[in-house]
Swiss-Prot record:
Lipid-substituted positions (S-palmitoyl cysteine): C402, C403, C405
Residues covered by region (Disordered): 69-88
Species of origin: Homo sapiens
Any matching Pfam family: 7tm_1
Record's protein name: Endothelin receptor type B
Keyword Magnesium applies: no
InterPro entries xrefs: Endthln_rcpt (IPR000499), ETB_rcpt (IPR001112), GPCR_endothelin_rcpt (IPR051193), GPCR_Rhodpsn (IPR000276), GPCR_Rhodpsn_7TM (IPR017452)
Modified residues (Phosphotyrosine): Y439
Outcome reported for the amino acid change (mutating L17F): No effect on cell membrane location
Post-translational modification: Palmitoylation of Cys-402 was confirmed by the palmitoylation of Cys-402 in a deletion mutant lacking both Cys-403 and Cys-405.
Impact upon substituting L17P: Found in patients with Waardenburg syndrome 2; likely pathogenic; loss of cell membrane location; new cytoplasmic location
Disorder this protein is connected to according to its UniProt record: Waardenburg syndrome 4A: A disorder characterized by the association of Waardenburg features (depigmentation and deafness) with the absence of enteric ganglia in the distal part of the intestine (Hirschsprung disease). Hirschsprung disease 2: A disorder of neural crest development characterized by absence of enteric ganglia along a variable length of the intestine. It is the most common cause of congenital intestinal obstruction. Early symptoms range from complete acute neonatal obstruction, characterized by vomiting, abdominal distention and failure to pass stool, to chronic constipation in the older child.
Keyword set, alphabetical order: Albinism, Cell membrane, Deafness, Disease variant, Disulfide bond, G-protein coupled receptor, Glycoprotein, Hirschsprung disease, Lipoprotein, Membrane, Palmitate, Phosphoprotein, Receptor, Signal, Transducer, Transmembrane, Transmembrane helix, Waardenburg syndrome
Sugar-bearing residue positions: N59
Amino acid sequence: MQPPPSLCGRALVALVLACGLSRIWGEERGFPPDRATPLLQTAEIMTPPTKTLWPKGSNASLARSLAPAEVPKGDRTAGSPPRTISPPPCQGPIEIKETFKYINTVVSCLVFVLGIIGNSTLLRIIYKNKCMRNGPNILIASLALGDLLHIVIDIPINVYKLLAEDWPFGAEMCKLVPFIQKASVGITVLSLCALSIDRYRAVASWSRIKGIGVPKWTAVEIVLIWVVSVVLAVPEAIGFDIITMDYKGSYLRICLLHPVQKTAFMQFYKTAKDWWLFSFYFCLPLAITAFFYTLMTCEMLRKKSGMQIALNDHLKQRREVAKTVFCLVLVFALCWLPLHLSRILKLTLYNQNDPNRCELLSFLLVLDYIGINMASLNSCINPIALYLVSKRFKNCFKSCLCCWCQSFEEKQSLEEKQSCLKFKANDHGYDNFRSSNKYSSS
C-alpha cells in the first residue's frame, strides 16, 4: 500500500529543510561547503585535515595570495571560529614559476660547469705557484673553496628538486643543503671583509713588506672565518624540515623553513631571517669595504709624496691587489642585490588583502627568481673577475687552462724566480731608504 501523495510531498520538503539546516550548521561550525574550498596551488602547505601551514620565502607570497582572507571580528557570530572569504586567485605567478623553472636549470648547469673549472683552477694556481702564496691570495683560495663546496653539493640537489617538484631526499639532506649554502655565503662575506682590512693594513704600514708564505695571522683569520660561518649556519639546519603538501589530490613533500618552530629563538629567527640576511650577509661587507677603502685612499694620498722611486713596482702590486679585492666586493654586491631587494620589498610592500596584489606579486616573483640566478652566478664569477682584473692571475689562468706551454711549472719557474728576486730587491731598496731617512733625521 502506497502512502498518500500529500504525505510524500511533506516528507520531501522536510528532508530538504533538514539538509539545508545541517549545511548552515556545518558552515557556522567552521566546515566549508563543498564548492567553497579554494583550489590548492603549488605553494599551499597543509597538514591534513584542517590546518594550513605557509612556507617562508618567495613562494610564501604566492601561497598567501591564494589563501582565504579572514573575516573581521565584528562580523563573526559569538562563540564561532573565524570564517574566511576566498580572494580571487592569481594566475600570473604559476606561469612565472613554470617559465623560470627551465631558466634556473640552465643557469644552474652553467654555474656548475664554470664554477668547478674556475675555482679548481684558482686553487691549483695558488697551490702550485709559490710566489702566489701570500696573505690575500690565501683568503681568495678560502673563498674559492667555500664556493666549490656549495657548487658540488647544493646546485645538483637544487636542480633535481626543481625539476621533480617533490623533495626526493630525506630530512638529513633537507637540513644539509641550506646549511652548506648559508655557510658558503658566510665564508664569502667574511673573506671579503678580511681582504678589505688586510689591504688597509698593507697600505697603512709601508714597512710591513711580506715575503713568500702564509702569515700566521692570515691562518688564524681563515680558521675564524670558517668557524663563525659554520656556527651562523646552524639555525638553518635546525629550522629546515620536510612538510607534506596536499596538491590536487596527491601529497608532495617539500623542504623549507618550518612555519612552526619549537623554541623561542628559532621562532624569532624565522621572523627576522630576511632582515638578518640583508644586514649581515649583504650590508656588512659593503660597509666594511667602504670604510677601510676610504681610509686606505686617504693614507695613500698622504704618503704619496714621501715614496721612493725604488718602491714604485711594489706600490703598483699593492694597488693591483686592492683593485682586485674591490672588484670582488663589487661583483658580490651586484650578484646579491636583486635577491635581497625582492625579499625586503615583499616584507614592506606586499599585502595579501590588497585587490591589486597580483601585479605586485608577479613583479616580486620575477625579481626573486632573477635574484636567485644572480646569487648562484656569484659562486663561479670570482675566478672570471680575477682573470679580467689581475695580470698575474690572468697569466696563470692562461698557462693552466689553455696549455700554451708544455708544463705549467716549467713556464712559471723562471717568472717566479724573477718575481721573487725583484720583490727582494725592492725590499732591500726600501730598507736602505728607511736607514738613510733615519740617519738624516737624527
